[in-house]
């Protein structure tokens, strides 16, 4: 064998075989370097994009005035002011602030819209006359707060209990409602109506309802029209009856009955002379009917 053939055989022996493990590792490394996207990751990306689009739609609806299923934490809940409650409720906590595993701490500031006083009704009259029963009822309500004050309303058979915070008032309202006291009466507890402070304490002028009666008004309101005057009312029957009365004569208006006297009108005489002393006509007394 020549030297050239030996060199070719050595080169072929030194070349790596594709079936060997080394060649397989190099092929896997080449495949790993190729940027391919798994099918599962593609689906996850699509779902994440869908959630972001839905969140964007919800934000657009909230800014455009559309209907939202869930209230935003930045929005304020308005309460009916006619019930004595404040116009705005404190903002809702954000989603990440409250942990579902741990119970949130109760803050007294979140109950500012609740009244701090309760009204106790259906109190037995014996309680107002007995100081011991009064003290027993006061101690019953002091179990919720030691700083409670009491106002006894004997005429109404009621008691007003004032607390320093709304939580104590709410606990007393819930636990002592329909409570049997002294085995004689069942008391009832209600929240007292809170007093809402007003910014303007001055009286407001009345509504200009009487401007329609002025013809024409100083400054006619919207929709004002002149009112037509009604025709004068003339009672011709009354004028004819007065004309039939002759001066100096008596006229019977109502005849006499068994239990009532007659009604007679005596007309006055006209003065024939000039101004001076005039003689008054005598007043004839009406005769009473005879009684059996």
Swiss-Prot record:
Protein name as catalogued: Protein sarah
Result of changing residue 215 to A: Loss of function in completion of female meiosis. Loss of function in completion of female meiosis
Pfam families (UniProt xref): Calcipressin
Similarity-based family: Belongs to the RCAN family.
Effect of residue 102 to A: No effect on function in completion of female meiosis
Gene Ontology biological-process annotations: calcium-mediated signaling; egg activation; female meiotic nuclear division; long-term memory; male pronucleus assembly; meiotic cell cycle; olfactory learning; oogenesis
Residues that bear Phosphoserine: 67, 72, 100, 215, 219
InterPro entries hit by this protein: Calcipressin, Nucleotide-bd_a/b_plait_sf, RBD_domain_sf
Biased composition (Low complexity): 1-51
Gene that produces this protein: sra
Protein species of origin: Drosophila melanogaster
Segments of this protein annotated with the region Disordered: 1-111
Gene Ontology terms: cellular component: cytoplasm; cytosol; mitochondrial matrix; nucleus
């Amino acid at each position: 064998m020549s030297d050239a053939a030996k060199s070719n055989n050595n080169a072929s022996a030194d070349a790596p075989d594709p079936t060997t493990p080394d060649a397989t590792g190099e092929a896997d490394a080449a495949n790993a370097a190729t940027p391919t996207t798994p099918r599962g990751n593609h689906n996850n990306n699509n779902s994440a994009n869908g959630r972001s689009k839905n969140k964007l739609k919800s934000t657009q609806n909230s800014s455009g005035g559309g209907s939202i299923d869930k209230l935003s934490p930045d929005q304020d809940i308005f309460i009916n002011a006619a019930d004595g409650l404040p116009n705005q409720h404190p903002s809702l906590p954000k989603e990440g602030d409250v942990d579902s595993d741990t119970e949130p701490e109760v803050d007294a500031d979140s109950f500012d819209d609740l009244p701090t006083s309760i009204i106790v009704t259906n109190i037995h009259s014996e309680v107002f006359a007995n100081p011991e029963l009064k003290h027993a009822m006061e101690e019953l309500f002091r179990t919720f707060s030691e700083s409670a004050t009491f106002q006894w309303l004997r005429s109404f058979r009621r008691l007003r209990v004032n607390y320093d915070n709304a939580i104590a008032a709410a606990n007393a309202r819930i636990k002592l409602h329909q409570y049997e006291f002294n085995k004689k009466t069942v008391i009832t507890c209600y929240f007292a109506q809170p007093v809402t402070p007003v910014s303007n304490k001055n009286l407001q002028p009345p509504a200009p309802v009487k401007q329609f009666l002025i013809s024409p008004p100083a400054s006619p309101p919207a929709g004002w029209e002149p009112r037509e005057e009604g025709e004068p009312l003339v009672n011709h029957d009354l004028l004819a009856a007065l004309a039939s009365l002759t001066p100096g004569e008596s006229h019977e208006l109502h005849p006499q009955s068994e239990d009532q006297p007659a009604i007679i009108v005596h007309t006055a005489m006209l003065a024939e002379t000039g101004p001076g002393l005039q003689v008054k006509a005598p007043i004839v007394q009406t005769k009473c009917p005879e009684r059996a």
